[in-house]
Curated annotation (Swiss-Prot):
CDD domains: archRadA
GO process terms (BP): DNA recombination; DNA repair
A matching Pfam family: HHH_5
Keywords assigned: ATP-binding, DNA damage, DNA recombination, DNA-binding, Nucleotide-binding
Nucleotide-binding among keywords: yes
Gene: radA
Keyword set includes ATP-binding: yes
Family affiliation: Belongs to the eukaryotic RecA-like protein family.
Binding site for ATP: 115-122
Molecular-function GO term, any one: damaged DNA binding
Protein name: DNA repair and recombination protein RadA
Length: 323
């Protein structure tokens, strides 16, 4: 047993994994796979694509990395509970919404906010970006933020407003928010893949994608392209989830809705992305407009929290309870 522990301590580089020589290790590092955990949560196809080795060989490398990282095996419920103690929660700025989400947005999970135009999705993303830079005692992570902006909706002026209302230095807050504009779905996927490079230079604990599905929706039109769209969207979401797992980060995404023509009673609106997004997002929050600056937030999916809804307010100061 002691020998196994010693071997684990020694095996700290990619070259220590069986089947990984200098050339393969270099290709892996160039593509963001530069530690054992990154290899352990990868798929054989991903490693095969970036290194040129066969999927069988890639699977063996991943299996060895998982053994070293001590993941991928059966665990007791007690062990999982202990591991979940590493999970942290980021405040939304609204106590009502925090309570609905069990204390805020969880790390190592994807939280999706979906709704019609003007429902407050982008406002919440801006607020989360500001909140992430706040001290831990105020519900933040005192860390940097990465945002993939697909619709050119990021506004530094809004960040300044929100930062001032929180008593933060707006210039310092802006310096800690790293924004990349995604011009199409493939560029969006590439930015998510390369996010790890930025995370190594800065302490990134929040990754935002606003909006998750806009490019996929506009580029893949018709039933003939649906399978390809869903395949790419699936890969993209798993890249995001992997980032959250490796860096113990919050993943927050926005999503658009469309009307279902077959629904005659009740709310006909449904989020874009179908089962792929529905099954991969850990928490799903439906936002609807109400009177004035009020919004109704409904939690419709969670692994352990009950469905429910609450009222929040979006004002000049940001996202709050309006009291």
């Amino acid at each position: 047993m002691e020998d196994n522990e010693e071997n684990k301590e020694k095996k700290t580089t990619l070259e220590d994994l069986p089947g990984v020589g200098e050339a393969t290790a270099e290709k892996l590092r160039e593509n963001g796979y530069d530690d054992i955990m990154a290899i352990a949560v990868a798929s054989p196809k991903d490693l095969s694509d970036v290194t040129g080795i066969g999927e069988g060989a890639a699977a063996k490398i991943i299996a060895a990395a998982r053994k070293f990282a001590d993941i991928g095996n059966f665990e007791t419920g007690e062990e999982i509970l202990e591991r979940r103690k590493t999970i942290q929660k980021l405040t939304t700025g609204s106590k009502n919404l925090d309570d609905l989400l069990g204390g805020g947005l969880e790390t190592q999970a994807i939280t999706e906010f979906f709704g019609e135009f003007g429902s407050g999705k982008t406002q919440i993303m801006h607020q989360l970006a500001v909140n992430c830079t706040m001290p831990k005692e105020k519900g933040g992570f005192d860390s940097d933020v990465m945002m993939i902006d697909t619709e050119n909706t990021f506004r530094p002026e809004r960040i300044i407003q929100m930062a001032k209302s929180k008593g933060l230095d707006p210039d310092e807050t802006l310096k800690r928010i790293h924004v990349a504009r995604a011009y199409n779905s493939h560029h969006q996927i590439l930015l998510a893949e390369k996010a790890q490079e930025t995370a190594k230079e800065f302490n990134i604990r929040l990754l935002i994608v606003d909006s998750l599905t806009a490019h996929f929706r506009s580029e893949y039109v018709g039933r003939g392209s649906l399978a390809e769209r869903q395949q790419l969207l699936n890969k993209h979401m798993h890249d995001l989830l992997r980032f959250g797992t490796i860096y113990n980060a919050v993943i927050a995404v926005t999503n658009q809705v469309s009307a279902r023509p077959d629904v005659f009673f009740g709310d006909p609106m449904a989020p874009i992305g179908g089962n792929i997004v529905g099954h991969t997002a850990t928490f799903r929050v439906y936002l609807r407009k109400s009177k004035g600056g009020k919004r109704i937030a409904r939690l419709i999916d969670s692994p352990y929290l009950p469905e429910g809804e609450t009222v929040i307010q979006i004002s000049e100061e940001g996202v709050n309870d309006g009291t």
